[in-house]
Regions:
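Structural preference for beta-rich elements and adjacent junctions enriched in aromatics
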Residues: 1-205
Length: 205
């Protein structure tokens, strides 16, 4: 979808919501301890220079305390995208809270991250319906969306493959209703998103 690269991010959000297939993040792996299940949906597409992901979330608790790069955004109302390119033993993790704050790295396993620099993170375009100012947890009924654009050049590509491995998450570990939703099952005893052996196949529009 090369036309996406020409649009401002708010228009990209609208385009993805209207024209691209949507998928639910519906797997509650650790239901006995973390049963809360907000609605979380994503769509994904590629332009000529960027990979786009759009998230929509409906939840009862909204939190965005972290606002600096590479902080613990998974404590907040958070969505995540992990990807692994063909023939690579590394994977990339991109974690965003609802105001677009980013924790991102590439690595071979959980213990050895190579975190993205501030300059690298600045190349990731974001559009957050909640704005970009931090706030403490609120309780109610909230709908929010986040659209991100990851440049191919950031992950060392000039063009993006039509098929990759990856996984999508919705979490919020420090809210009153902590939860860990997954697009595809992760068969571990405890929540652990850094398990590339459970990544699924992603075909890009």
């Amino acid at each position: 979808m090369p036309e996406l690269d020409k649009l401002p991010m708010d228009a990209v959000c609208d385009y993805l919501e209207l024209h691209v297939s949507k998928y639910g993040i519906n797997c509650v792996n650790w239901k006995d301890r973390f049963p809360y299940h907000p609605i979380a949906i994503f769509s994904i597409a590629r332009g000529e220079k960027y990979l786009y992901v759009n998230y929509f979330v409906r939840c009862n608790y909204l939190r965005a305390v972290n606002y600096e790069n590479n902080k613990s955004v998974s404590e907040d109302s958070c969505v995540e995208f992990f990807l692994q390119l063909p023939d690579s033993d590394e994977y990339w993790n991109f974690e965003f809270n609802c105001i677009g704050a980013v924790n991102a790295s590439h690595r071979k396993d959980r213990k050895h991250p190579c975190r993205l620099s501030d300059d690298e993170i600045a190349t990731i375009k974001r559009y957050a319906s909640c704005g970009n100012k931090p706030f403490n947890e609120m309780e109610g009924m909230f709908n929010w969306s986040l659209t991100i654009a990851i440049p191919f050049s950031l992950i060392g590509l000039t063009a993006f493959p039509a098929e990759i491995k990856g996984i999508f998450y919705k979490c919020a570990s420090a809210t009153k209703m902590p939860h860990y939703l997954i697009w595809a099952p992760i068969r571990t005893e405890n929540p652990d998103f850094h398990r590339p052996e459970f990544f699924g196949k992603i075909c890009l529009e």
